[in-house]
Structures are given as C-alpha cells and as structure tokens.
C-alpha cells in the first residue's frame, strides 16, 4: 500500500464500511473494529514495513499513519523495519543459546533420526503448544486442513515449487517437536523440510482420515496432499495443507493465504534475499519468557480471579476432562448496532455486545451476579516483539473474562464500556500459563464456557487467483474454507463461537449434553440471542431491567 487512499480502502474493506465514512478523528473501535480485525489490517501495514503498536492503533490510527503515508516526518511510536534479536551462537552445536540442555536434546534428536547439523534453532514450547501436543499425541485432536481448489497444466510440479518457496521463508513448516528423557518438550527449527506428499483420490475421505491420527514426535508438522479429479466434486482438483495444531491457529491461515498469493504473483521477488525469512514462533516463545515473568502473570491473574465463582453452567464437581461436545445450536442474526450517546458519531463494537450478552445469559441461567467465562484471544497484542503480526503459530490462547452485574444503577452503555475496557486490560496478560482455563496439576477449577469471537477474516482480500499464462503449471487457485473441518474434545461444557460476516452474525453453541441438558441449553441460547437484540435496542436502559 503506497497511498492514503489505498489505506482507507483497505480499512473500509476490513470494517465492511464505505471509505467516505472514515474521519481522521475516528478510533478503530468507533468504526466497529475489534482486535482480530486490527491484527488483520496491521498485517497489511507490515507488508509496507510500517509497524504501529496496537494500543496506538486503537486510540487514533489516522493521525499517526497519515503523515507516514504522505512522506512527512513525525516522531511517534512507529518503527520502520527492524530485525529480531536472535541471540548468541553456541559453537558446540551451532545453535542459539536457550534454556534447553544441549546434551539432553542431542540424545532426543538421535531418537527421531534428526542430525544435529540440520538444526538451526531450538526453543521451549509454549503452554498452548503443550496443551495441543498432549491432545495430538493422544489422538484427541485432528490436523488442521487448509483446502484450495486448483487448476493447471502440471499441478504436481507447480505445487511442489510453491511449497518449496513457502517452506524456505516460513520456519514454522520446518519445526518439529521432540521430548527428552526428563519428559521436557522442545521445538526444533530445521534447515530443511521433512514434509511429505500424498495423492488421495477422494478429498472427503482424506479429510476424515486426518481427524483420526495421532501426532508423532520428531515428525514433520505438515503434510501436503493433491487430489486430482475428485468424483464427489465434479472432477475438481484440490491442494490440501494439513498442519498439527501445535503449529498454527486461525490467523495463520490468513497469513498462509497471503504467502501463497505472493508466491504465485511474484515468485522471483518472493524467493529473493531481499524478502526476509518470517519470524519464528520459537523466538516469540523465548521472548515472551524473558519479558513476561511467570510471577507477574500469576500475581495478575490471582488478583483478577480473587473471589470469582466459576460454577455458572453446572456444579464444579461435575466437570469433565475431554468431554464430547455432542450438542449444537446455530442461529444467524443481524449484527447488533448500538448508537453512542456521546457527541461523536460511532458504534459500540458488536464483540462487546456479544460478551455482555453472554455474561447476562449465564447470570440468568445460574442466578449469579459475578460471571467468569473463557475468552479466546488472538495472542498478537504484544508490541515488543518485532513483526509479531507475521508470525505463524498457535498464538491464539484463552484468558478468564469476568463481568459483574450487581450494580442496580448501571445502564447498558456503562456495561458495554466496561466490557470494552476489560478486553483491553486483560489482553496484556494473554500469553503464558494463564490459570483457570484448562485443568491443571493442582486440581483448580476451570471456566465452564469458552467464547470464540471470529472476525471477518473470511472474505477479505483475494479469495481466488487466476494467472495470465494459460499453459502455466498452476493457472488458478481458490481458497475453499467451506471445506475445512476440525474436531476436538473439550474440557468446557460450552464452546460458543460467533462469526461476523457480510453484515450478519452467526451464533454457534456447542455443548456437552451430560453437563447441560438440551432443554437448559435451548433456554440459555434463546436468552443469549434475546439479550443481544435487547442490548442493541436498550438505549441506556438499566441492566437489571434486562436481567429480570
């Protein structure tokens, strides 16, 4: 992006508004943005080597970015370029110094037939990686499948070349997990890929098969598949990237799509030395450990959770580890639009309405006025790690989210503003060992519902690409997110997923019927839907009036 007008168009596309609606004084939240959409747009900024810290972006993006795009000089929290500190080399193995024991790791490498000469970097694994690794090793979580419909003269050769470029610039595809004799896991970045290809004849059968396997230590985290002339899909061809969940998240799909399109459009420029390798997730884990101390994190969350009651869906004694989400309810409703009463124009973010409505629905269900549930976070709020917005990996995490509803004089607008502040305040502490989200060794209780606010990453940018050369190895590619599937067992009684898309809000509630009967689930879901509409139309009404 080279002009202010182009940036304005990009912003408008992300927010699903007209460019003319964006004023220089608007904040991101005023225009209906949320943290995931912010990351999406900031990723575009990173392509132009412009880094803006997330908080500044929320507060007033245009006053800061406009001078940069006009070529003016202005001091402020913007950094152009920059590199990641990679640490000191250890000559004994040619690796970066980490907190891992090199001798122990070398033994673990030999067990999985990985030569130490092929190792570039090592790092501990993150808590979210450990969570998904245990699920994967025990067969409780399938692979993440990214499906593309493809056309071309020689797809095998063309896709092999595309994958070679992709793996060269993105170290997450060359990262394997190992375990030493002490039971400690380490992620290892290799100098070359050990990925494999398969050529199934039936796409759906292949996708089903990827849901039943187990993750293997020392194995490639990625598998590529090419399905030619699938009969179930009218002879169409499909390219599938299948990844372990320890190596990706929802935003990684968006980044992978951008990389693929760049490779297809500008293969020479993409492969050049001027196009640097993307930051490695393992470096982010080490950075996090150095900058966010576990004791600070523990103190924050201990204070945050003091006096919280987590039993707002079922009694604590009934909690299940790895239960089946065998119930499902789906509804599509209009995106809630709440007009602000303040002097400036703007809207309350729909995400804040959703969070407030869910807290109120749980309050009605449980009779409690102090509600805590889990909130899935994109994990990319930090501005201290260079180019974090281009890091592929499982940065998505979860934190407790607490809403009190015992103020009899509080009005709906005050509640929504309080929810907004809570989202920003807790985002700083989203990485690390966050308590009360999953079962732990100490037997502490965990949240009984998890809310995943999916933004409109779907539908942004190029959904397909068609080349100029009719005889090229790859002539067309189309992202087929509609064919993705993902299943896993849950420790939460409820997984609430929302998706904002094309002016509508899709609500999907998965639940464990052994913890929440169908009748109660139906009543809770109906209450949630009703409260979304009531909050949008409340116009400053008392919150207690909506809870009665």
Swiss-Prot record:
InterPro entries: ACP-like_sf, CAT-like_dom_sf, Condensatn, PP-bd_ACP, Ppantetheine_attach_site. GO terms for cellular component: cytoplasm. Disulfide bonds: none annotated. SUPFAM superfamilies: ACP-like (SSF47336), CoA-dependent acyltransferases (SSF52777). Keywords: Ligase, Phosphopantetheine, Phosphoprotein. Its EC number is 6.3.2.-. Disruption phenotype: Loses the ability to produce fumonisins, but accumulates two new metabolites, HFB3 and HFB4, which are biosynthetic precursors of fumonisins lacking the tricarballylic esters. PROSITE patterns: CARRIER (PS50075), PHOSPHOPANTETHEINE (PS00012). Pathway: Mycotoxin biosynthesis. Residues 122-537 are annotated as: Condensation. The keyword Flavoprotein does not apply. One of its GO terms (biological process) is fumonisin biosynthetic process. The modification O-(pantetheine 4'-phosphoryl)serine is found at residue 35. GO terms for molecular function: ligase activity; phosphopantetheine binding. FUM14 encodes a nonribosomal peptide synthetasecontaining two domains, a peptidyl carrier protein domain and a condensation domain. The condensation domain catalyzes a C-O bond (ester) formation and can convert HFB1, a precursor of fumonisin B1 lacking the tricarballylic ester, to fumonisin B1. Belongs to the NRP synthetase family. Nonribosomal peptide synthetase; part of the gene cluster that mediates the biosynthesis of fumonisins B1 (FB1), B2 (FB2), B3 (FB3), and B4 (FB4), which are carcinogenic mycotoxins. The biosynthesis starts with the FUM1-catalyzed carbon chain assembly from one molecule of acetyl-CoA, eight molecules of malonyl-CoA, and two molecules of methionine (in S-adenosyl form). This is Nonribosomal peptide synthetase 8.
């Amino acid at each position: 992006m080279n002009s202010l007008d182009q940036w304005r168009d990009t912003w408008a596309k992300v927010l699903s508004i007209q460019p003319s609606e964006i004023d220089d004084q608007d904040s991101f939240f005023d225009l209906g943005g949320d943290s995931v959409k912010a990351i999406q747009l900031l990723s575009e900024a990173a392509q132009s080597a412009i880094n803006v810290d997330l908080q500044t972006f929320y507060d007033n993006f245009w006053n800061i970015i406009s001078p940069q795009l006009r070529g003016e000089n202005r001091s402020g929290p913007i950094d152009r370029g920059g590199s990641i500190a990679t640490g000191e080399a250890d000559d004994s193995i040619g690796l970066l110094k980490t907190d891992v024991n090199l001798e122990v790791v070398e033994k673990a490498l030999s067990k999985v037939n990985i030569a130490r000469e092929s190792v570039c970097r090592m790092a501990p694994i993150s808590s979210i990686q450990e969570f998904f690794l245990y699920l994967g090793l025990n067969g409780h979580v399938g692979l993440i499948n990214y499906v593309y419909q493809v056309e071309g003269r020689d797809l095998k050769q063309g896709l092999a070349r595309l994958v070679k470029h992709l793996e060269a610039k993105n170290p997450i595809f060359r990262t394997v997990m190992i375990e030493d004799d002490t039971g400690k896991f380490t992620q290892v970045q290799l100098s070359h890929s050990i990925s494999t290809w398969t050529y199934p004849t039936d796409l759906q059968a292949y996708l089903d098969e990827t849901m039943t396997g187990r993750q293997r230590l020392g194995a490639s985290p990625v598998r590529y598949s090419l399905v030619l002339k699938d009969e179930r899909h009218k002879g169409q061809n499909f390219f599938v990237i299948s990844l372990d969940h320890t190596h990706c998240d929802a935003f990684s799909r968006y980044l992978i799509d951008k990389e693929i399109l760049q490779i297809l459009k500008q293969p020479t420029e993409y492969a050049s030395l001027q196009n640097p390798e993307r930051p490695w997730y393992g470096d982010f884990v080490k950075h996090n450990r150095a900058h966010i101390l576990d004791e600070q994190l523990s103190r924050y969350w201990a204070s945050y959770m003091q006096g919280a009651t987590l039993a707002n869906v079922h009694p604590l004694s009934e909690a299940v580890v790895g239960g089946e989400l065998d119930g499902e309810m789906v509804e599509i409703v209009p995106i809630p639009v709440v007009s602000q009463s303040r002097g400036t124009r703007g809207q309350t973010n729909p995400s804040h309405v959703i969070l407030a409505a869910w807290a109120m629905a749980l309050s009605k269900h449980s009779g409690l006025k102090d509600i805590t549930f889990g909130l899935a976070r994109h994990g990319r709020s930090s501005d201290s790690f260079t180019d974090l917005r281009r890091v592929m990996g499982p940065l998505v995490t979860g934190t407790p989210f607490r809403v009190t509803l015992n103020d009899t004089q509080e009005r709906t607008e005050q509640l929504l503003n309080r929810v907004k502040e809570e989202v920003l305040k807790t985002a700083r502490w989203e990485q690390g060992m966050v308590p009360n989200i999953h079962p732990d060794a100490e037997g502490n209780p965990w949240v009984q519902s998890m809310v995943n606010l999916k933004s409109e990453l779907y539908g942004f940018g190029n959904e397909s690409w068609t080349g100029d050369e009719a005889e090229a190895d790859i002539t067309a590619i189309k992202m087929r997110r509609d064919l993705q599937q993902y299943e896993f067992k849950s420790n939460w009684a409820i997984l609430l997923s929302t998706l904002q898309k094309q002016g509508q809000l899709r609500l999907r509630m998965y639940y464990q019927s052994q913890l929440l009967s169908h009748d109660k689930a139906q009543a809770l879901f109906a209450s949630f839907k009703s409260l979304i509409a009531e909050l949008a139309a409340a116009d400053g009404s008392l919150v207690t009036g909506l809870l009665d």
